[in-house]
């Protein structure tokens, strides 16, 4: 019988550790094909090496809770222990029953899942999907602005419950009308207006013009590890996308 081989996920990545190493024994037989003992006292034998154990760090209750949150929704949840990098929960929805991919019907079930172009249950949104960053991204822009010297901790902006970022385009903010925020209160309140102004300062004042400012901003983000593969122990993933000046030129036309 053939040996089972890890083909996907964790089993694939750690196949070399989970498999172990086969051993060999050389035996001596008589003319009646009966074993009479080890050949040359076993000096050519190769001992086998047992496979290593693999312990997942998933928190079962947290995993169940994440799956409940994404029931009848599309999205992904990744929960990581910052101090160790352990993955406590990894959820993708819509999902599928893993039992469908074992047994005699696995090929038929796989084709059915692969052909579902609406729900895409085989697409791991926790590892492969690309989403716009949320409010934690604001702190990176704050660090970049401080590094470039375009703001300091006392830089203050007024928030009128949002701001215009294009012609007729308004982004709401939960800050009260007329709130003045410096860097610390802007982070504390997660003020959209404050960090929109910080981003504009980075782009306008970091380099010699907007193009250079955008590219400087991107360089800083790459230094934080964004836009790169994480190097984790799963064989799939996306490195993310950070736009540069040429991207904006393409979509908004140079000088527009």
Task: State each model region's role.
Residues 30-45, 83-136, 140-256:
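Beta-lactam-recognizing serine transpeptidase/beta-lactamase-like catalytic domain environment
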Residues 35-76, 80-83:
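Conserved, well-ordered alpha-helix/loop/beta-strand core segments that scaffold catalytic motifs
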Residues 1-51, 89:
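Small/polar-residue-rich segments within soluble enzyme cores
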Residues 1, 55-57, 76-80, 88-92, ...:
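Soluble periplasmic/extracytoplasmic beta-strand elements of cell-envelope proteins
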